[in-house]
């Protein structure tokens, strides 16, 4: 009796262990066709899985970014898009199938209810087919449906080139349910909404971050859920530093070499300035060729405009130097003429002194002849370029005067006073004839004639050697300080 009791206990133990052990079976033993037919019996694809609406969880797995175009304002990327929802009608836990989930092809998706989500702002999108359509559906035993697509998507980007080439772009992907409002489908992001297969690297941009957002948008026929992800790309400005900023800086600096040339090397300095200006224009046009035509000023535009101004100012400086050099040559010729007729006056005074000793003539004749002599001398000085200096030496003859009626001491004093006041009387004579008398008095009050205000071409060149580099240095400090402070990303 005791032996039978022990056998009964052993039997119950092994039977309980067998019942509690998990089923071990092969997936090949599952008849998926029969299972699908069973699940889809009396299944209506137009009815919601649940009357109170469906919560759809979405996530994106970015495989790579193909490229970004500022001209068209969009970017392309390859992404695996997943959407997950609960459909109790597809639960097969009660069927004692030897699997917790089954993977089905894209054809199965057409036979069940789907949330009909779409990328609402896409310019173009397509499902990869390599070689077959990259779509699958995973069905769990509790009725959880996981649908996945491998897509190539092109969506718009917000392009603002005011900070170019230190700018950043924002590109968005906006997801909505095309057919169902919030009473039927509610979109929500997964706990880990965005994942990257690998680091995104582009020739011109770096992906510096992304962010997700959830919104509700009101349409005339209801309120729709909207899930949005924004990718932020920062431009790599190293290319523009080496292809735009450094060459233009060297072009501006090379235009200053003309300051060290001789003043008479006009053709060489003009060639240098014009060549620098053309090179700068060509560099600027090469950069603009790959950018959209915008009406606002970009960061690079400010640099190029000031570079053109610096080179143009070198040409203006050259024009000023050439004009000053011409005036200097005219003054040199005029000084030679002036020295010649001053010698003539000295000779005339000596002859008058000798004539005084001999007597006769009178002061009146000398005073009457002084003004015509001065007029001839002034005409000769102003017409120096035409060879009037040579003619003057023969045209001007000392006045033939006789001062016998005046004593030698009075005569000498009178002649000295008359000839020392030549410049003042000539100025007074011209002042009566001119129409700008008031302006002349104002200028003489500010710039006294006894001070040397002459500026030479050499002085202008020497001043330019200092002022142009100093101005360009100040511009660089202000330019880089302002735009580096405006940058919204680390260097």
Swiss-Prot record:
Q: Name one GO biological process term.
A: chloride transmembrane transport
Q: Which UniProt keywords apply?
A: Cell membrane, Disulfide bond, Glycoprotein, Ion channel, Ion transport, Ligand-gated ion channel, Membrane, Postsynaptic cell membrane, Receptor, Signal, Synapse, Transmembrane, Transmembrane helix, Transport
TM ranges are 241-261, 265-287, 302-322, 465-485
Q: Which residues are glycosylated?
A: 55, 101, 418
UniProt-annotated location(s): Postsynaptic cell membrane; Cell membrane
- Top-level taxonomic group: Eukaryota
Which GO molecular function, any one, fits this protein according to its record? Answer: transmembrane signaling receptor activity
- SS bond list: 157-171
> GO cellular-component terms in the record?
postsynaptic membrane
According to the UniProt entry, where is the signal peptide? 1-19
Q: How does it sit in the membrane?
A: Multi-pass membrane protein
User: Among its keywords, does the record have Plastid?
Assistant: no
Family per similarity comment: Belongs to the ligand-gated ion channel (TC 1.A.9) family.
Q: What is this protein called?
A: Ligand-gated ion channel 50
Q: What is the lineage of its organism?
A: Eukaryota, Metazoa, Ecdysozoa, Nematoda, Chromadorea
């Amino acid at each position: 009796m005791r032996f039978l009791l022990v056998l009964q206990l052993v039997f119950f133990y092994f039977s309980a262990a067998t019942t509690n052990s998990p089923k071990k079976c092969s997936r090949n033993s599952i008849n998926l066709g029969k299972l699908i037919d069973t699940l889809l019996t009396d299944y209506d694809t137009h009815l919601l899985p649940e009357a109170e609406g469906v919560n759809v969880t979405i996530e994106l797995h970015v495989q790579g970014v193909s490229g970004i175009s500022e001209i068209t304002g969009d970017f392309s990327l390859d992404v695996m898009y997943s959407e997950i929802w609960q459909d109790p009608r597809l639960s097969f836990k009660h069927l004692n199938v030897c699997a917790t989930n089954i993977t089905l092809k894209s054809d199965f998706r057409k036979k069940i209810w789907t949330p009909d989500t779409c990328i609402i702002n896409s310019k173009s999108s397509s499902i990869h087919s390599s070689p077959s359509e990259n779509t699958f559906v995973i069905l769990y035993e509790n009725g959880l449906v996981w649908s996945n697509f491998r897509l190539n998507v092109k969506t718009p980007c917000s392009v603002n080139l005011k900070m170019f080439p230190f700018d950043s772009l924002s590109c968005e992907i906006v997801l909505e349910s095309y057919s169902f409002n919030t009473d039927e489908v509610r979109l929500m992001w997964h706990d880990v909404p965005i994942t990257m297969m690998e680091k995104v690297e582009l020739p011109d941009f770096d992906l510096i971050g992304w962010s997700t957002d959830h919104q509700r948008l009101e349409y005339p026929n209801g309120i729709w859920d909207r899930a949005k992800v924004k990718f932020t790309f920062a431009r790599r400005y190293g290319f523009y530093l080496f292809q735009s900023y450094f060459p233009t800086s060297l072009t501006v600096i090379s235009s200053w070499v003309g300051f060290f040339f001789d003043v008479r090397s006009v053709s060489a300095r003009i060639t240098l300035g014009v060549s620098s200006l053309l090179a700068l224009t060509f560099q600027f046009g090469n950069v603009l060729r790959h950018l959209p035509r915008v009406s606002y000023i970009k960061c690079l535009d400010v640099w190029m405009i000031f570079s053109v101004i610096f080179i143009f100012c070198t040409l203006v400086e050259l024009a000023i130097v050439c004009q000053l050099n011409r005036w200097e040559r005219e003054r040199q010729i005029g000084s030679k003429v002036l020295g010649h007729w001053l010698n003539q006056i000295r000779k005339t005074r000596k002859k008058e002194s000798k004539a005084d000793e001999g007597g006769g003539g009178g002061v009146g004749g000398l005073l009457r002849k002084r003004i015509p002599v001065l007029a001839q001398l002034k005409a000769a000085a102003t017409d120096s370029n035409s060879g009037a200096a040579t003619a003057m030496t023969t045209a001007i003859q000392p006045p033939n005067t006789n001062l016998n009626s005046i004593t030698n001491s009075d005569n000498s004093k009178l002649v000295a006073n008359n000839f020392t006041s030549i410049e003042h009387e000539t100025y007074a004579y011209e002042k009566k004839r001119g129409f700008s008398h008031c302006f002349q008095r104002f200028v003489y009050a500010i710039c006294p004639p006894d001070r040397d205000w002459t500026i030479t071409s050499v002085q202008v060149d020497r001043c330019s050697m200092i002022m142009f580099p100093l101005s360009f240095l100040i511009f660089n400090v202000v330019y880089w300080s302002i735009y580096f402070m405006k940058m919204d990303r680390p260097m």
